[in-house]
Amino acid sequence: MVLTLVVMGVIIVLAVAPTGMCSFEPGRPENGPVREVDAGTFLHMEAASLGVPVRDPGVPEGWTSNSARRSTAGGEEAAVTGYITADEGYLQLTQTGASERDAAATEGREKTGEREVAGATVSVYAADSDEVRDVWAIDLGETRALISGAAPESDWETLT
């Protein structure tokens, strides 16, 4: 039985290797080029169709918008854009008309405090689990902006 498995493994390797569809590179993976999307155009189109104001955060030089999609947050439609920061961190900005609590208090998150950033009050939502990322929520009147991701706190403040 073991011999049969070895023979099958050799046959599979011999059949797949010439296709060039497989590769093995031991060591740490390297980041490839970031595919850029036009977040400004996406947000402009979303502002026209969501029924709530959507803002373009105007990210600093060195940041790249790499994703834009429509999703839901708190049961309402939402515009979601993702950004690779200059330090290769990642932040996601979700804009929705849902209430702050409905949009941010998901996956076991609870409001853990507030802070002032650039003149805005930011509500911080966190969960007990390390697998659930924190969310910063900013009430912009008719719209709530939610920031989540993996980047230094200074980048979170920049996106606010």
Features from the language model and the residues they span:
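Ser/Thr/Pro/Gly-rich low-complexity linker/stalk segments immediately outside membranes or between
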Residues: 21-36
